[in-house]
């Protein structure tokens, strides 16, 4: 398995940023290396708070990297070269700009939209302290406070709120995402 970070792999359009078409262009090179599978690091729309792991839309290509047509052409070229395509799905969290998190912020505490994430009331007389002392992998508290006083969990950057895997909506959303990419030629 050959991991590719599309943003830095090969720039076809000359904008200084690697792109999906660049992966397609280098398919013969990958085949000649003996690669039998490529693993694409996140290439989804993102504000790049964490190198693309802060995903805004799991079912699209970041427009800076290309289009869905570019992705489909890349998957087809890979398969013609005998190379499988694996995409990096990030199921721990979304970006804070993901539609689900925006709905959660607009919703009341305890609502179904909030339940897609891990929201908690804070400690202290006025809830001014995080729910616990957990630390983010990036340093600092793993909790961020929102305008209504509740806190949400982010084990990574605060732009990456953790999803609640006890919520069936999250299961369904990621099943839809996996089906989507399977329908677009991915092998894993």
What label would you give each PLM region?
Residues 1-175, 179, 183:
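Acidic/aromatic-lined carbohydrate-recognition and catalytic surfaces
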Residues 187:
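Receiver (REC) domain switch/active-site residues of two-component response regulators
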């Amino acid at each position: 398995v050959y991991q590719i970070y599309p943003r830095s792999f090969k720039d076809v359009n000359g904008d200084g940023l690697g792109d999906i078409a660049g992966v397609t262009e280098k398919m013969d090179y990958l085949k000649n290396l003996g690669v039998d599978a490529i693993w694409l690091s996140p290439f989804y729309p993102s504000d790049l708070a964490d190198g693309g792991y802060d995903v805004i839309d799991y079912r699209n290509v970041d427009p800076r990297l290309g289009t869905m047509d570019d992705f489909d052409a890349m998957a087809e070229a890979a398969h013609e070269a005998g190379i499988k395509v694996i995409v990096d799905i990030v199921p721990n969290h979304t970006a804070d700009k993901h539609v689900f998190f925006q709905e959660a912020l607009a919703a009341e505490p305890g609502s179904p939209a909030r339940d897609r994430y891990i929201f908690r009331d804070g400690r202290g007389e006025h809830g001014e302290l995080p729910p616990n002392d957990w630390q983010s992998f990036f340093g600092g508290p793993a909790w961020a406070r929102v305008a209504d006083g509740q806190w949400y969990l982010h084990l990574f950057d605060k732009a990456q709120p953790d999803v609640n895997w006890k919520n069936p909506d999250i299961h369904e959303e990621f099943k839809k995402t996996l089906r989507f990419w399977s329908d677009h030629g991915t092998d894993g």
